[in-house]
């Protein structure tokens, strides 16, 4: 028998499936929201419904946005000669928190993985190659995780871009082997961007 009723137990179970939350944390959050349901819960429900309806991928870079083109791609003050390639949106957000990069981004939507059957055709690599030609890009910074999949993806992209003549660089010191960008602190990300190297 559910101690709090089926609807509340279902909400707790659903929240417990979110990344970084377990059953105990989910239960505490749900109790907190119920106690403040006229303020925080109603506001959160409205915001979540709005995001569910309007969130989409930027047509240019793949960032998550509420319109067709994200604010980064629309920003005329961004450097236009550089594209920083990341695995997913969480990595883009991590780099933005560090404020070390002032160019534009390209989100791949994953990494090459034979185990997970993710090939080049499953990623946004063709769009990257098209952007290089269309936007006059001079440097592609591969800010990919230092995992086997991340480095395999980096090498594949470097080889695919070789005929274009664009400079291809990658993050250097500061990123631990096997590390994920989303878990790094801002200083480490900044140092890694400044010490990038040619691949």
UniProtKB/Swiss-Prot annotation:
GO terms for molecular function: DNA binding; zinc ion binding. Coiled coil: none annotated. A zinc finger (C4-type) spans 58-73. The keyword Zinc-finger applies. It comes from the Bacteria. SUPFAM superfamilies: Recombination protein RecR. InterPro entries: DNA_Rcmb_RecR, Rcmb_RecR, Rcmb_RecR_Znf, TOPRIM_dom, TOPRIM_RecR. Keywords: DNA damage, DNA recombination, DNA repair, Metal-binding, Zinc, Zinc-finger. Residues 81-176 form the Toprim domain. Pfam families: RecR_C (PF21175), RecR_HhH (PF21176), RecR_ZnF (PF02132), Toprim_4 (PF13662). One of its GO terms (biological process) is DNA repair. Belongs to the RecR family. May play a role in DNA repair. It seems to be involved in an RecBC-independent recombinational process of DNA repair. It may act with RecF and RecO. This is Recombination protein RecR. It comes from Paracoccus denitrificans (strain Pd 1222).
